[in-house]
Amino acid sequence: MGIKKINEWEKAVVFLLNLDGWELEHCGDGYSRYDAKGKTSKGVDCVIEMKFRNKYYEDKMLEKDKYDALMALDDVVKIFFVNDPKGNFMYYLNTLQMPAPVKKHCPDTTMWTKKRLLKD
């Protein structure tokens, strides 16, 4: 899945949430730490980081540096959205008890490449 397709999926999620009373704008085209920002259906400021996986993993993964950057934002609801073959999952990061970080060899960029880095 290329970055253009990922951006289309991100925009589709924003569109669907906006149909449900959210007020979001897509901002995943650049180098932002999140893919959408705006207000929840209850009018609370929020940001959403989105991941689209081709394979199902029981344990959902968010890179530690992205998590830390999201958690550093003040007075905003932080949401992690994951789409995979088994469904769509939204996690409210503000109060979620996170496990200890685990180092994994992952692609060096958003797009799947053969180059791997050890990431938290």
Please provide the spans of the model-predicted regions.
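Short amphipathic alpha-helical segments and helix-helix/interface helices
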Residues: 14, 66-71
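Intrinsically disordered, low-complexity terminal regions enriched in charged/polar residues
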Residues: 90-120
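Active-site-adjacent loop/helix micro-motif of nuclease/hydrolase catalytic cores
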Residues: 54-67
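Beta-rich catalytic cores
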Residues: 32
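Nucleic-acid nuclease catalytic cores
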Residues: 71-97
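A structural signal for short, well-ordered beta-strand segments and their strand-loop junctions
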Residues: 26, 47, 78-82
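Conserved catalytic cores of phosphodiester-cleaving nucleases, focusing on short active-site segments
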Residues: 36-38, 42-54
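Acidic-basic catalytic patches of nuclease active cores, encompassing PD-(D/E)XK
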Residues: 1-28, 39
